């Protein structure tokens, strides 16, 4: 018998990651300032496959406290992803937070109150965990075609995927207010109320393109969803003689509302 020749095409994937950060802290009088700057790069490449992707993040954070009572946090990040449309690869995401530790105020100093803090924050974040090459038009084998009076057909190319126009980050605009409370060195309570407004969610494109085209309609960043709710955590920690025990419970209520998912009317 004649030998059978087998040919296997392998793939080598390389993953390169680089991170760097710098931290600067300063204290003067009743002031406390801490700043952090971070840079990260992540690159993944597979030899022989068009699935390579790269990500970059530049982040700056600052925390300021006055007299251990009044707190302010600022954050600004810039993110880039090769998965996105070349004109929309960079996203800017700011955030701000503030807190007030009331238990440090003289008018609330007492033996039974251990800790009481009011806090609020607002920030924008983005995610882009999409498939590679969604923004590109892709061509593939188009089957057999006859040219003029030729008796045999010939293979050709056709458009198999319409790229997502303006593919960008899905964004989350989140507002949170809360209170942290601890008393008698035993009881602790945390209450959070939040509102999350998500925009640019990738959803089906609907009937934006006629079915005569012969391919699936590309998705679009048109989805909008609102989430709001409240979360409560209550804990009790105590000790009786040599016996230590913990009791705790959590309650959460969340309401979700779809504002837009590019539905057909």
Where are these regions (language model features)?
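Extracellular/periplasmic, surface-exposed regions of secreted and cell-surface proteins
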Residues: 1-265
């Amino acid at each position: 018998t004649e030998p059978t020749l087998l040919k296997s095409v392998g793939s080598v994937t390389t993953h390169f990651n680089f991170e760097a950060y710098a931290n600067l802290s300063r204290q003067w009088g009743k002031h406390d300032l801490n700043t952090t700057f971070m840079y990260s790069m992540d690159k993944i490449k597979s030899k022989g496959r068009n699935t390579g992707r790269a990500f970059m993040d530049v982040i700056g954070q600052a925390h300021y406290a006055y007299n251990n009572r009044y707190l302010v946090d600022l954050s600004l990040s810039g993110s880039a992803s090769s998965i996105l449309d070349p004109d929309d690869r960079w996203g800017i995401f700011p955030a701000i937070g503030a807190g007030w530790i009331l238990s440090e105020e003289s008018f609330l100093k007492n033996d039974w109150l251990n800790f009481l803090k009011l806090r609020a924050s607002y920030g924008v974040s983005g995610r882009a965990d999409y498939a590679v090459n969604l923004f590109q038009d892709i061509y593939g084998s188009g089957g057999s075609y006859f040219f003029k009076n030729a008796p045999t057909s010939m293979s050709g190319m056709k458009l198999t995927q319409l790229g997502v126009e303006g593919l960008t980050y899905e964004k989350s605009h989140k507002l949170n207010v809360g209170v942290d409370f601890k008393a008698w060195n035993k009881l602790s309570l945390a209450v959070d109320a939040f509102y999350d407004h998500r925009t640019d969610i990738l959803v089906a494109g609907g009937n934006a393109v006629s079915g005569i085209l012969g391919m699936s309609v590309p998705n679009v960043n048109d989805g909008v969803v609102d989430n709001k709710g409240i979360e409560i955590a209550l804990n009790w920690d105590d000790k009786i003689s040599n016996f230590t025990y913990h009791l705790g419970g959590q309650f959460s209520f969340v309401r979700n509302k779809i504002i837009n998912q590019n539905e057909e009317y």
